[in-house]
């Protein structure tokens, strides 16, 4: 490959004016330099050696020269720059040509930037084009710049305009650079778009999540010489991510030891499906669109796409996000969303992640430690006050119900994907539902084929009132085991017993009905649910079962789980909640049958 450039730089002609008076105080002041057909060939090797580094001869004196060089403005005509940076895997060719006629700055900048300090910006005099690769990604672009570069005079902003594509990312900027000799400040209108925000990482080093296709339009201000590190502020931007709108302001500080991104974002109307890529829960077609190489196996439900934890230690973050209105189907009655995301040295915290659901709240604290391999996860969730009539708005029998769903869940696990985390997790799940109803029609609304089969076998075509449904599951190494799972209906007490295996996504559940009172319950044989999450299968057991674990619900041996579930009954509603009576009965010790004492 290329190891050195034949010439570092060349000029056809150079013209300059020298101010004679400052020579009296040992200052070489050049008010203006004009360069004719400048060309630079820049080369940096993989070992860091660069042809723009010069070994100057050692001075006989350690004292600095008393003379000072003061260049005020520099102008140029048609020129070119080539860059071959083997360390950054970047090869670029830049061509600069004079425009036929200067273009006024305000004509391209618009009203927002053509006011204030930027109003003094020069006209655009040159057009430029760039082509090549940047950090291994194809890059192409074009734009316009001014003719006289005001090197020191901040009152003469230098105009910039560019449209650049790099990989799947597109950027358009128009604005000014001030005090360029000291890389002083940028004032730009910036439009960004691409197939996923995560694709900005190799270009900018900013760690952003996987998203659907996005576009933003906002005001970028940069102060490049801040003491704490260069500061970039993308303020009052508006955009779209998938079918959701996005607004806000973000600040990025290139501080040490890690840069930090902070800000507040809002979405007036958030499509819930647009959150799918955050955990790899979008379709394979959508993964391909955003440039993700992993694919979800057809026989797996839990997302296998891995979090990019190797990026999490490259940047810190403190960002608040509010989704004011959630767009979803009737099966997902989520109304709003709020989260406070903090990323610090690879530890990602969502504290809280809060959803409004069916008139209640789903609140969770999530800690994902990406600084460890595999990633260590801890999740705590609580569901409070989910109104059943809002959970199932299309199910008429539930519309007169005052019932609620309440629950708690916690888990800890390790792994770099949702599937890996759940496949080896420890934790528990507790849930109570009171004053509900169920029928074949409800399972059809929810799209549950297996549920449809079970309800039909248990209750026929009738709508059945559920006094209480109570569930307590333990989770150990990815295997969730029923400690208590019971439906108390007007006709029967239905016990569900068995396991759900998150490691292999297999179901092994038995459903056993017990008739109540003098009513004769028609089903004699228990049911089963087998198969996988993707293809569950239900059927009727050939004969009676030997009770396992919590299978002795009807005999009242679930003292511990019943007592812990009582905590989910709201104190103000305990008298009306039919779960209270059921769980109180289950707390009593089992009675030993007569004759077996």
What is the predicted function of each stretch?
Residues 2-4, 20-26, 56-67, 341, ...:
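Short aromatic-glycine motifs in intrinsically disordered, low-complexity regions
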Residues 59-61, 113-115, 279-310:
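Intrinsically disordered, low-complexity segments enriched in small/polar residues
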Residues 1-10, 29-53, 73-75, 80-82, ...:
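Small-residue helix/turn framework positions
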Residues 555-564:
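Short, glycine/alanine-rich hydrophobic alpha-helices that insert into or span membranes
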Residues 18-24, 306, 412-418:
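Outer-membrane beta-barrel proteins
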Residues 590-592:
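Short cysteine/histidine-rich zinc-coordinating motifs and their immediately flanking basic loops
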Residues 14:
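An amphipathic, basic-hydrophobic helix/alpha-beta surface used to engage anionic
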């Amino acid at each position: 490959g290329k190891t050195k450039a034949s010439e570092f730089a060349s000029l056809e002609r150079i013209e300059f004016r020298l101010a004679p008076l400052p020579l009296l105080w040992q200052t070489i002041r050049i008010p203006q330099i004009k360069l004719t057909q400048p060309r630079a060939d820049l080369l940096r090797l993989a070992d860091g050696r660069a042809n723009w580094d010069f070994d100057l001869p050692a001075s006989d004196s350690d004292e600095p020269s008393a003379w000072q060089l003061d260049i005020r403005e520099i102008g140029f005509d048609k020129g070119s720059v080539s860059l071959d940076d083997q360390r950054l895997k970047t090869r670029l060719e830049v061509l600069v040509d004079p425009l036929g006629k200067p273009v006024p700055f305000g004509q391209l900048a618009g009203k927002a930037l053509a006011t204030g300090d930027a109003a003094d910006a020069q006209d655009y005099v040159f057009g430029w084009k760039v082509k090549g690769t940047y950090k291994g990604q194809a890059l192409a672009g074009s734009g316009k710049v001014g003719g006289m570069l005001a090197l020191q005079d901040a009152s003469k902003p230098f105009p910039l305009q560019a449209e650049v594509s790099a990989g799947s990312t597109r950027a358009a900027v128009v604005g000014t650079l001030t005090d360029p000799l000291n890389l002083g400040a940028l004032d730009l209108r910036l439009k960004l778009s691409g197939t996923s925000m995560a694709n900005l990482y190799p270009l900018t080093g900013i760690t952003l999540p996987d998203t659907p296709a996005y576009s933003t339009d906002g005001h970028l201000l940069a102060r490049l010489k801040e003491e704490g590190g260069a500061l970039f502020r993308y303020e009052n931007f508006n955009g779209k991510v998938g079918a959701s709108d996005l607004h806000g302001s973000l600040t990025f500080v290139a501080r040490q030891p890690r840069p930090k991104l902070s800000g507040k974002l809002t979405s007036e109307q958030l499509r819930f499906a647009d959150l799918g890529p955050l955990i790899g829960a979008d379709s394979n077609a959508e993964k391909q669109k955003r440039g993700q190489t992993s694919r979800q196996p057809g026989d797996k439900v839990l997302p296998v796409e891995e979090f990019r934890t190797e990026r999490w230690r490259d940047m810190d973050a403190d960002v608040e996000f509010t989704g004011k209105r959630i767009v979803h189907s009737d099966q997902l009655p989520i109304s709003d969303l709020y989260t406070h995301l903090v990323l610090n040295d690879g530890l990602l915290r969502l504290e809280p992640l809060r959803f409004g659901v069916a008139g209640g709240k789903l609140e969770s604290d999530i800690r994902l430690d990406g600084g460890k391999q595999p990633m260590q996860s801890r999740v705590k969730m609580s569901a409070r006050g989910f109104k059943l009539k809002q959970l199932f708005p299309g199910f008429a029998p539930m519309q007169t119900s005052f019932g609620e769903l309440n629950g708690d869940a916690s888990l800890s696990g390790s792994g770099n994907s949702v599937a890996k985390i759940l496949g080896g997790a420890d934790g528990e799940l507790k849930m109570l539902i009171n004053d509900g109803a169920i029928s074949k029609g409800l399972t059809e609304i929810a799209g549950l084929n297996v549920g449809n089969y079970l309800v039909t076998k248990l209750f026929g075509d009738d709508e059945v009132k559920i006094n209480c449904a109570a569930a307590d599951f333990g989770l150990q190494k990815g295997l969730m085991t029923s400690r208590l799972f019971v439906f108390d209906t007007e006709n029967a007490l239905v016990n569900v017993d068995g396991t759900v295996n998150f490691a292999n996504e297999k179901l092994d559940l038995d459903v056993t009905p017990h008739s109540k009172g003098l009513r004769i319950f028609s089903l004699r044989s228990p049911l089963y649910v087998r198969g996988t999450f993707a293809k569950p299968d239900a059927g009727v057991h050939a004969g009676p079962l030997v009770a396992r674990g919590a299978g002795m619900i009807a005999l009242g041996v679930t003292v511990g789980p019943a007592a812990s579930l009582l905590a989910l009954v709201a104190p103000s509603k305990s008298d009306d909640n039919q779960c209270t009576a059921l769980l109180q009965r289950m707390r009593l010790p089992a009675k030993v049958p007569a004759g077996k004492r």
